[in-house]
Design a protein with these regions (language model features):
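A conserved FAD-binding loop/helix module that cradles the flavin
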Residues: 281-283
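An anion-binding loop in the catalytic cleft
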Residues: 343-356
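Phosphate-binding core of ATP-grasp and ATP-grasp-like enzymes
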Residues: 175-229, 234-267, 271-279, 291-304, ...
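ATP-binding N-terminal substructure of ATP-dependent carboxylate-amine bond-forming enzymes
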Residues: 1-114, 118, 133
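Active-site nucleotide/adenylate-binding loops and adjacent lid/helix of ATP-dependent enzymes
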Residues: 105-194, 198-217, 221-244, 357-358
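Residue-level detector of structured alpha->beta connecting loops
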Residues: 33, 72-73, 143, 177, ...
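Short glycine-/aliphatic-rich beta-strand segments at the starts of folded cytosolic domains
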Residues: 307-317
């Protein structure tokens, strides 16, 4: 179902998922006079406290989904593992953005890599693994070092294991429960970057400046903007992002993770949602990725992605959130706390953006 006309202030955006991304989407929507209705199964969802309404129910609860659909004007989501049946159920009743095609493509790593490669965009060598024979065939083709990942689910390093020359592929497959998988060749990259792009219902596209990302224990720690890469490399990455978002007939903000290896840009994966590596836009741009996503799904004109400051975004993980008082006192720091009840090890509890004058 398509959105017929732009949604005026006072309309309601439905959001599947109640984590920090939904929370920041709801806060951005409120600035535009739009209401948000959060649908999530967890009672302590951080987004509940900042939304006009919420429904706590399972994603499989069709009665609750039907009521939710009747109370909103458009539906979006904060995470890519929305059950396919849930997306299909809602898409028949209310506009869903991004649509199910993008969702289903990103949910399966083999389909995702096949789609990207089909556009002529470089990806790591890959092969599907479904049984012992296909594992042996994939291993013979890809070799080591390589990474075995579940085809579905998994983020921040979950659902994957590395294979080196002294480690059997069979043991790696056992580590991930012998689930359907993808074997990817290791990319000897120089830097990790991402592209944060938006596309509206009318096909307009806006692409932000490219962040350079640093991970610790498979979890994003910092995003530095501008990325310390050649201008030609950054422009190539932005063009790749535009190609992907257009080919998906996408509506909303997308995060595309990439590797830089020499002069080459290699796409790693797609996240059909606002993205952690785009949090810097909240304070270094006039229009953040969260407002941009709301604008896009509601049929509003896209805002300018222009950056007014250089910035380093740093995630606050686990107990690091207890440093909030010191961070709040720093004049060049913009602090964002997610309101989560428990600071578990590795859990994203907040982030801060450190701004400096724009140099380039």
């Amino acid at each position: 179902m398509q959105l017929a006309t732009p949604l005026p202030p006072g309309s309601t955006v439905g959001i599947l998922g109640g984590g920090q991304l939904a929370r920041m989407l709801a806060l951005a929507a409120g600035r535009l006079g739009l209401n948000c209705h959060i649908f999530a199964p967890e009672a302590d969802s951080p987004a509940f406290s900042v939304a006009a309404a919420h429904t706590q129910a399972a994603y499989s609860d069709e009665d609750a989904l039907a009521r939710f659909a009747s109370q909103v004007d458009v539906v979006t989501y904060e995470f890519e593992n929305v059950p396919g049946l849930t997306a299909a159920f809602l898409e028949q009743r209310v506009p869903l953005a991004p649509g199910s095609r993008a969702l289903f493509t990103a949910q399966d790593r083999v389909d995702e890599k096949t789609f990207i490669a089909g556009l002529g965009i470089p990806v790591a060598p890959f092969a599907a693994v479904a049984d012992d024979d296909s594992l042996a065939s994939a291993f013979a083709c890809i070799g080591t070092p390589s990474i075995l990942k579940t085809r579905r689910f998994g983020y921040d390093g979950k659902g994957q294991t590395a294979i080196s020359g002294n480690r059997a592929a069979e043991a790696a497959w056992a580590d991930i429960g012998k689930q359907p998988a993808i074997l990817e060749g290791f990319v000897n990259f120089d830097k990790e970057i991402s592209v944060i792009a938006a596309r509206s219902w009318d096909g307009s596209i806006a692409v932000y400046d490219v962040p350079e990302n640093h991970h610790e224990h498979h979890i994003l720690k910092t995003s530095t903007v501008p990325a310390r890469i050649a201008p030609e490399t950054a422009e190539n990455a932005r063009k790749i992002g535009g190609t992907i978002i257009a080919a998906l007939d996408y509506v909303g903000v997308i995060g595309i993770e990439m590797f830089v290896a020499g002069d080459d840009v290699i796409v790693n994966e797609i996240a059909p949602r606002v993205h952690n590596s785009g949090h810097w836009t909240m304070d270094a741009c006039a229009v953040s990725q969260f407002e941009q996503h709301i604008r896009a799904v509601c049929g509003w004109p896209l805002g300018s992605p222009t950056r007014h400051s250089d910035v380093v975004m740093t995630n606050l993980l686990g107990d690091e959130i207890h440093d909030w008082q010191r961070l709040a006192a720093l004049p060049d720091v913009c602090l964002h706390v997610y309101g989560k009840s428990e600071a578990r090890r590795g859990r994203k509890m907040g982030h801060f953006n450190r701004l400096t004058s724009r140099q380039a």
